Amino acid sequence: MTQTLPAGLTATAMVAASSANLGPGFDSLGLALSLYDEIVVETVDSGLTVTVEGEGAGQVALDSSHLVVRAIEAGLRATGCVAPGLVVRCRNDIPHSRGLGSSAAAVVGGLAAANGLVSQTDWTPLTVEQLIQLSSAFEGHPDNAAAAVLGGAVVTWTDGAGAQARYAAAPLRVHPDIHLFPAIPQQRSSTAETRVLLPDTVSHTDARFNLSRAALLVVALTERPDLLMAATEDVLHQPQRAAAMPASAEFLRVLRGCGVAAVLSGAGPAVIALSTEPELPAEAVEFGIANGFTIAEMAVGDGVRWSTGVAAGR
C-alpha cells in the first residue's frame, strides 16, 4: 500500500562532503568533512521544480534526472510513500567532480530530505542502516555514502554483489590532534573516468602492502596520528591515476616530501593532507597556490541531519 503525501510538507537536509580511500583504504575508508550542501524539499499538488545555487548551478539537470530528485523519490518509495509534486531547492558548497563526495552527498541528502517529509506522517522513516544501504546502492560502493550518513571516519564493507549487495559501515573516532587540509584544484575528474586506469588484478605483494597500510591507518586515525605518514602509503590506485592528474600527483610529492601525510581525495583530483600540525609547510602551500589549488583547513564533518520545515540558515 502506498501513501500519497499531502501538499504543504517541507523538510530540510544538511549533508557533508567526504574524502574516500585516504590512501590505502580503496573503496573502504571514508571521512566526512565540514563542507555542506543544503536541500529543501516541499510537496506540492503536482509537477516538479528544481533550483540549484552554488556549485553546479547552470550545469546540472533541473528535471527528474537530477540526482537529488532521484534520491528523494527512492527514499519515499522505500517508505511506502509518493509525492504528488515536488519543489526541490539545492544550495551546494561541495565542489563537483573533484573527489569530495558530491554525488554521495546529493544521494544521502535526498534520502534524508525524504525522511524529513515522511516523519510528518504516520509512516516510518528510513533507519540509518537503510540510509547506508540505499545510498551505497546508488554509488556502487559505501565509503563516501556511509561517511556522509554517519559523519566522522568510517570503515565500510560489502557482502555480495550486484542487486544482492549488502553494504555496512562502522564508525571511527578521529583523533583530536589531526588537522585536515583539503586542497581543491580547478581540474575536474569523474570516478568513472579514473577507474578505467586501474588494472583488473594486482599482485599478491601489492595487495599485502595495502592491507597492512589500511589496517595501520585505522590505528593512526584513532590512536596514533604519529603513524599517518606510513599509514597513508598506497600502491593500488594513486600511482595508476597520477598521469591523469599530474598537478595533483606533484602536489602529493611535495607535501609528502615535507613530511605531511597527503593522499588523493577519493578518485581525485583534490588532495587532502592529514597533519598533527595546525598549518601546512609554507613550501607546500606556495606550490599548491601556484598550481591552482584552493587550500583550507576543515573539521571532521557531521553525519547527515534533517528537520521539518525550512532551516533558518547555516
Swiss-Prot record:
GO terms for molecular function: ATP binding; homoserine kinase activity. GO terms for cellular component: cytoplasm. One of its GO terms (biological process) is threonine biosynthetic process. PROSITE patterns: GHMP_KINASES_ATP (PS00627). Pathway: Amino-acid biosynthesis; L-threonine biosynthesis; L-threonine from L-aspartate: step 4/5. Keywords: Amino-acid biosynthesis, ATP-binding, Cytoplasm, Kinase, Nucleotide-binding, Threonine biosynthesis, Transferase. It comes from the Bacteria. Its EC number is 2.7.1.39. It is found in: Cytoplasm. Transmembrane segments: none annotated. InterPro entries: GHMP_kinase_C_dom, GHMP_kinase_C_sf, GHMP_kinase_N_dom, GHMP_knse_ATP-bd_CS, Homoserine_kinase, Ribosomal_Su5_D2-typ_SF, Ribsml_uS5_D2-typ_fold_subgr. It holds the Pfam family GHMP_kinases_N. It catalyses: L-homoserine + ATP = O-phospho-L-homoserine + ADP + H(+). Its main location: cytoplasm. SUPFAM superfamilies: GHMP Kinase, C-terminal domain, Ribosomal protein S5 domain 2-like. ATP binds at residues 95-105. It is an enzyme of class 2 (transferase). Catalyzes the ATP-dependent phosphorylation of L-homoserine to L-homoserine phosphate. Belongs to the GHMP kinase family. Homoserine kinase subfamily. This is Homoserine kinase.
